[in-house]
A protein has these predicted regions:
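Alpha-helical transmembrane segments of multi-pass membrane proteins
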Residues: 2-250
Length: 250
């Protein structure tokens, strides 16, 4: 949350680093929106966030739809398993890019590939595989400068944007780069969802092959680059410091 205690990091340095993180975070968020829309076309329950899945589980149990309830429970457990895998692979609360992120991305790509094959064959076992990929992605991104970076749902993003705007109205200083960062993630998720619906209408579950391939290739490149030390992901990105502001006094 933007109002939590920030990590002890120089604001200008934080801004320079977030410029490197923004493209990846936007792609993550767009991928989650795409995957969630595609999965919704197969089974009317979200896989990128668990609030809707838990509600669907309760509805199915009440209606006595045991097969659907089992699928909903599998989605929830799959998401949990993905977060568990991220905890084992990445093992950090704070955002520290390294080779393990490349491995985690390749695992996510493998899970989406598995889900693509299963869903194309009409097997619901593809649903927990998709949810596991989303849980893995959501847990890969973590805390940075007081922001909880989550890329598979937008409830937290909208909450944080609202809180920051409220602080601004109350004449409290806010960091505009954080607000822009959250707005980019929100927009990316929506655009990804829109593209996902179009792809699902045309290709069905096979559309999941696109993010599966993207995650696999991106993970391999990330691992290679960090393994060979070819680039410092946290190098200086520019001279502009972060801008802060508060609601103008009357």
């Amino acid at each position: 949350m933007p109002y939590s205690h920030p990590q002890p990091l120089d604001r200008a340095q934080a801004y320079r680093k977030i410029r490197h993180l923004l493209p990846g975070a936007v792609l993550f968020s767009a991928t989650a929106g795409f995957v969630n829309s595609t999965a919704l076309g197969f089974f009317h329950s979200p896989v990128s966030h668990m609030t809707g899945a838990v509600s669907r589980l309760g509805i199915d149990l009440h209606a006595g739809k045991w097969a659907d309830a089992t699928a909903s429970l599998a989605i929830i457990l799959g998401f949990l398993a993905g977060a568990l895998v991220a905890g084992v692979l990445v093992g950090a609360w704070k955002l520290i890019p390294g080779r393990r992120y490349g491995v985690a991305l390749m695992v996510q790509g493998a899970l989406l590939s598995l889900a693509t094959g299963l869903l194309m064959s009409g097997h619901r076992l593809g649903l927990p595989a998709v949810a596991m990929a989303c849980g893995l992605q959501n847990a890969m991104t973590s805390s940075y400068c007081g922001l909880m970076i989550r890329t598979t749902h937008v409830s937290g993003l909208i909450t944080d944007i609202g809180v920051m705007l409220g602080h601004w109205i109350r004449h409290r200083q806010i960091e505009f780069w954080k607000l822009r960062f959250l707005a980019w993630l929100f927009t990316a998720f929506g655009v990804g969802g829109w593209v996902g619906v179009i792809a699902d209408d045309r290709f069905g579950p096979a559309a999941l092959g696109v993010p599966a391939a993207g995650c696999t290739v991106a993970g391999a490149i990330f691992w290679f680059v960090t393994h060979r030390g070819l680039v410092d992901l946290m190098q200086d990105a520019g001279p502009q410091p972060p801008r802060t502001g508060s609601f103008p006094e009357r």
